[in-house]
Swiss-Prot record:
GO terms for biological process: oxalate metabolic process. It comes from Arthroderma benhamiae (strain ATCC MYA-4681 / CBS 112371). The active site is at residue 378. It is an enzyme of class 4 (lyase). It catalyses: oxalate + H(+) = formate + CO2. Residues 73-236, 270-414 form the Cupin type-1 domain. This is Oxalate decarboxylase ARB_02208. Glycans are attached at residues 228, 247, 254, 265, 367.
Length: 425
């Protein structure tokens, strides 16, 4: 059964996705071989077209039941405020993501992400507009820095921080080193010996602590004593309304303090100009790495910013240190994940998608577009970016052993490159 490329392009255009001809019928469970049949019941045509690897484009090498490893921010509930919005991907959205949760935070000009802190570390990547970052350490050191597209911040667990939008529209990818970011923690009363009584009488608390909420729940006479001010209703307008974003005007004030500003290895911010693009040996794109080697404070989240040329392949590899959490910024991708036990599954990704590859699972990522670069971020709950290349491993193993292991002629192994290619054109 043959179907013209014009049909492929037409139906893909309806869904707003890149056209790639996998054969069969686009958007239908009919493969090139003739296997399958049309959908006769309810279905979502746009989702079907965006995920050909589930239907007509499903590789024959996909075997077994592999859990869903993909989420789209477009499926997340958006919390809207005067001054911006937030939408998250947490473990209830993507249960396979144990290490990292993510969010998109949008601020209008002057919009402030409320002063707060977390019981986990927060990492952020600016991809639209620019922001002012404000932070204070337990030692009274402070930081005020302007971040523009590509720049990164990292706030350790418990660090006091906030940020404000500077341009008309500003947006940040935020990640936390805890997949179950919104989980409720418990403080157990010590006077119950029975665990059921402890659970029923536990005090719950969440991951984020907000300054305005804390002040609103503190007696005013205590606030007056703490801040050395009069008790004349100063904090009457401080509300416990959990506003994560508030509207304001762009800050023009500077700050000085006796313990000085955060600088050097202690800085909470990183400017992407300090991580030049690496032109990889494979010639298929570039990689920028930001981890504790060049951003020392970022001890629990490491990042690689990857750009693949049209048709390029992020080579077959795995990561020895952690799960890989992904955010796709632009373009269209295809990836097959091998999770051992003979199980593998292929996924399609587009801009705004997140994904996770299980700890040490083998995989590749391919740019399926013919004319658009693929740009995505790899994040790890680790202090460094690390991967093991399958091709390099085979090339650096005695060639007769490697050839026997995968049952290929030895000259196939002889031709493999001994340096890591990263991205292959």
């Amino acid at each position: 059964m043959k179907f013209g490329s014009a049909l492929v392009a037409a139906v893909a255009a309806v869904a707003g996705v890149a056209a790639k001809d996998y054969g069969g019928v686009p958007g239908q469970p009919i493969q090139k071989s003739g296997k399958g049949a049309v959908f006769s019941g309810a279905t979502n045509p746009q989702l079907d077209l965006q995920n050909p690897s589930n239907i007509n484009g499903q590789p024959a090498t996909d075997i077994g039941l592999v859990p869903n490893l993909k989420w789209s921010f477009s499926l997340s509930k958006t919390r809207m405020f005067h001054g911006g919005w937030i939408r998250e991907q947490v473990i209830s959205d993507l249960p396979a993501s144990h290490d990292i949760a993510g969010a998109q935070v949008h601020l209008t000009k002057g919009g402030i992400r409320q002063m707060h802190w977390h019981r986990v570390a927060e990492w952020g990547y600016v991809y639209a507009g620019s922001i002012l970052v404000f932070a204070v350490t337990e030692d009274g050191q402070y930081q005020i820095d302007k971040l523009t597209p590509g720049d990164i911040y990292y706030f350790p667990k418990g660090a006091a921080h906030s940020f404000q939008g500077i341009e008309d529209e500003n947006e940040v990818l935020v990640a936390f080193d805890e997949g179950d970011f919104d989980k409720i923690g418990y403080l157990f009363p010590p006077y119950y010996s029975n665990i059921n009584l402890q659970l029923s009488n536990a005090f719950n608390y969440r991951t984020t602590f907000q300054v305005a909420e804390w002040i609103a729940h503190t007696p005013q006479d205590v606030l007056a004593k703490n801040f050395n001010i009069s008790t004349g209703g100063t904090f009457d307008k401080t509300k416990s309304n959990m506003l994560e974003i508030i509207n304001s005007t762009t800050s023009t004030h500077n700050v000085t303090g006796p313990n000085g500003a955060l600088m050097g290895n202690s800085s909470y911010t990183f400017h992407i100009r300090d991580a030049p693009e690496i032109q990889v040996p494979g010639g298929g794109g570039t990689i920028q790495i930001v981890d504790s080697k060049n951003f020392p404070i970022s001890k629990t989240i490491a990042c690689a910013i990857v750009r693949l040329k049209p048709g390029a392949l992020r080579e077959l590899h795995w990561h020895p240190t952690a799960e890989e959490w992904l955010y796709f910024h632009s373009g269209n991708a295809r990836a097959t994940v091998y999770v051992s036990g003979g199980l593998s599954r292929t996924f399609d990704f587009t801009a705004g998608d997140t994904g996770v590859f299980p700890d040490n699972a083998g995989h590749y990522i391919e740019n399926v577009s013919e004319d658009e670069d693929l740009v995505y971020l790899e994040l790890y709950k680790a202090d460094r970016v690390a991967d093991v290349s399958l091709s390099q491993w085979l090339a650096l193993t005695p060639h007769d052993i490697a050839a026997a292991a995968i049952n290929v002629p030895i000259d196939v192994i002889d031709k493999l490159k001994k340096d890591k290619q990263y991205i292959i054109q």
